Amino acid sequence: MLALLQNWQSNCATSAHIPAYARHLPAEGGTVIVCWSLKGGSGTTVVSAALALTLSQRNNAAVRIVDLDGDIPSALGIAEPSGDGVTNWLQQPQRAPIQSMQIPVTARVSLIPRGSGSLMHHDLTSEHCNTLATELDMSNELTVVDAGSGHIPQLINNATTSLLVIRPCYLALRKAAHLSVKPHGIVLINEPGRSLGKRDVESVVGAPVLVELPLDPTIARCVDAGLLASRIPTMLSQHLAHVA
């Protein structure tokens, strides 16, 4: 396996040019940022929640989180919402405005919960994604979507900006090498002791690393204590400011 890894890294070093990240994320209507990963446990939910909080603070504007995976309430330290959510909404033949399901988290951040529908995020069809994108585009709120793990081209294609959350993991990068749709940028969760780094990830994915987040225990403690919404770690918000 070591020989295979070394050969693969050598190939990565000579791969195609990585496009520059030229997007800005203004707090304007129709701006939808989709955060996604290729494997569970990559940190997508924490990144999604923290990015929404950072955007609201930096822009002094309303930001909402669409939770397709169901873990955002736990990450934010709020009670699990009851009632319908985005999965129920997508399965309704006649839909009320999606903002009717928004739950306040802070003064400027709200949540559209996953809900109790049987629809899983990896079951989203092109019709589902187009319906959701059209609805979100009608609002003047900036939206961050936690799309969980799995490659959902229909969802990524409808995003203003898509961010792949990934660790420098050989297995994750093997999956990334076969993506049919590339992200606009990468949030790299750095772990000590990994053989792979930023250049390897950029070469395989074909997109620039916008943020390198250290695997910091203070972030985990903040989430475990339910304090992310009220006391986002400074280090986390400072790093995500490069995206926001």
Model-derived regions, located:
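Walker A (P-loop) phosphate-binding motif
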Residues: 20-63, 68
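Generic beta-sheet signal
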Residues: 31-35, 63, 112, 141-145, ...
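A short, acidic, flexible beta-alpha connecting loop/helix-capping segment that sits on the rim
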Residues: 116-117, 215-219, 227-228
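Conserved catalytic-core segment of NTP-binding enzymes
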Residues: 131, 135-222
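Acidic-aromatic/histidine active-site loop/patch
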Residues: 1-33, 79-98, 127, 174, ...
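Phosphate-binding loop that captures ATP/GTP phosphates
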Residues: 58-111
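A generic structural signal for short coil/turn motifs at secondary-structure boundaries
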Residues: 41-44, 75, 119-123, 222
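Cytosolic-facing regulatory segments adjacent to core modules
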Residues: 96-105, 111-152
